[in-house]
């Protein structure tokens, strides 16, 4: 599998995700629904937290070929082949508003994905449906205020 950037950056990103999961009070044995899983950065932390008796349903509206330099397909295949892969089900090209959900979840997670919603009304529709299938909803999003000059380029690219 391809890697991007230095391993120290990857460790920092993983520590961030592990901290989020801890703040969400994810426990062993929980059933978690993750909206906007992307390449699975938060998914991996969730799967670790729920343990062998838990389950993570990770969905994303993007397809397997989305993402560079690592696509969602490459990333999710790699995760599924890992020791925690049996705790996760990925559903890509899935629109949560139209997909069939027959099971209840302990918690729904939206981690760093809100800015992909083009309309606030769509996000509101997601949240209303999530209330019906999950006991709790946890949200984490990047702060869009830059505080250091070196953050400005990323801020502008994210704002497009």
Tell me the role of every PLM-derived stretch.
Residues 11-30:
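Conserved alpha-helix/loop element of class I SAM-dependent methyltransferases that forms part
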